[in-house]
């Protein structure tokens, strides 16, 4: 039985994507069909940091957080300016409607009143159709979700970009994530009760995690009716505990072929109705990247994944039912 939370119109759109020959449910195509136009996500940094840093943080995250290289996306720039400048630039490229994407960091790590001010302001632009908010599973208190639920009731498309990484407790402890699998499950269910959509971020190639466990993560997220996923390879960057493990020979990153093969396997074990927002990372600055050496470009990875799935004669969801 296929597990889905999407409505009938969304299901029709995804079925149409497959009928056109695509081998996985590409989010960009889905959005274009749903809204009859492309929608641009404006990334903004509101400088909220991460509550887990005081506990040492995750082993893959540097002390100061991951740098991003998007022009006009910086906590040093007022939010109004970040939105205005990026919106102006994207309008020149033909975009008319936008999501505001709160990234990086834990973007619910602030009092509810402050967050409401930020979210209200972001939605005050007539061109903005919704929000996408990156956060941790243990930082989604009821009062904050209730505010987001009001936006849903008013017709906005609200997404939580949730740092899942893995659905295995052992792995979360190795990563020093600072939360349990139960927190992930609760966060997803709490969002769904309010009509808030969830995009789970998943990392493949985590220390100590087996192929079977990675595939179980795909199936569990499907059974939790998650709407979308972003899939990433684990990247070793300077100034992290993971870097120490790497130089000691305690961890090795996946090579390109290993990663692409795992992505294909993961997609096969995922419900065909989970949207795929990403299959790789943004470019990691060479100044801080330790490993892997291969190019992480999203378009390249997406094309190679499509090529391998085609060679296998398979597609997303092919092994979800087994």
Curated annotation (Swiss-Prot):
Query: Which key words are in the record?
Result: 4Fe-4S, Iron, Iron-sulfur, Metal-binding, S-adenosyl-L-methionine
Q: Which SMART domains match?
A: Elp3
Provide any one GO MF term from the record.
catalytic activity
The source's superkingdom equals Archaea
Needs which cofactor?
Answer: [4Fe-4S] cluster
Where in the numbering of this chain does the Radical SAM core domain appear? 34-286
- Positions annotated to bind [4Fe-4S] cluster: 50, 58, 61
Q: Which InterPro entries match?
A: ELP3, Elp3/MiaA/NifB-like_rSAM, Radical_SAM_C, rSAM, rSAM_horseshoe, YhcC-like
Q: Name one Pfam family in it.
A: Radical_SAM_C
Q: How is the cofactor bound?
A: Binds 1 [4Fe-4S] cluster. The cluster is coordinated with 3 cysteines and an exchangeable S-adenosyl-L-methionine.
Q: Which PROSITE patterns match?
A: RADICAL_SAM
What CDD domains does the record point to? Radical_SAM
- Sequence intervals crossing the membrane: none
Report the SUPFAM superfamilies cross-referenced here. Answer: Radical SAM enzymes
Query: What's the family?
Result: Belongs to the radical SAM superfamily.
Protein name as it appears in the record: Uncharacterized protein MJ0486
């Amino acid at each position: 039985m296929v597990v889905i939370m999407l409505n009938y119109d969304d299901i029709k759109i995804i079925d149409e994507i497959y009928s056109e020959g695509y081998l996985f449910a590409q989010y960009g195509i889905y959005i274009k069909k749903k809204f009859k136009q492309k929608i641009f996500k404006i990334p903004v940094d509101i400088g909220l940091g991460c509550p887990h840093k005081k506990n040492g943080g995750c082993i893959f995250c540097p002390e100061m957080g991951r740098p991003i290289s998007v022009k006009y996306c910086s906590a040093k720039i007022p939010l109004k300016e970040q939105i205005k400048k990026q919106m102006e630039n994207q309008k020149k490229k033909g975009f008319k409607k936008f999501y505001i994407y709160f990234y990086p960091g834990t973007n619910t790590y602030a009092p509810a009143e402050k967050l409401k001010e930020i979210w209200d302001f972001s939605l005050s632009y007539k061109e903005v159709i919704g929000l996408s908010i990156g956060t941790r599973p243990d930082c989604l208190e009821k009062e904050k979700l209730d505010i987001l639920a009001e936006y849903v009731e008013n017709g906005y498309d609200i997404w939580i970009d949730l740092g899942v990484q893995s659905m295995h407790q052992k792995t979360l402890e190795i990563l020093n994530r600072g939360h349990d699998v139960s927190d992930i499950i609760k966060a997803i269910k709490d969002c769904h009760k309010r009509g808030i959509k969830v995009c789970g971020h998943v990392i493949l190639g985590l220390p100590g995690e087996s192929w079977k466990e990675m595939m179980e993560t795909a199936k569990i997220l499907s059974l939790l009716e998650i709407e979308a996923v972003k899939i990433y390879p684990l990247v070793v960057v300077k100034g992290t505990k993971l870097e120490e493990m790497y130089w000691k020979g305690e961890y090795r990153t996946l090579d390109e072929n290993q990663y692409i093969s795992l992505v294909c396997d993961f997609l096969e074990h995922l419900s065909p109705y989970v949207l795929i927002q990403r299959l790789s990372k943004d470019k990691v600055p060479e100044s801080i990247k330790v490993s892997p050496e291969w190019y992480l470009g999203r378009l390249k990875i997406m094309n190679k994944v499509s090529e391998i799935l085609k060679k296998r004669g398979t597609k997303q969801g092919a092994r979800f039912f087994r």
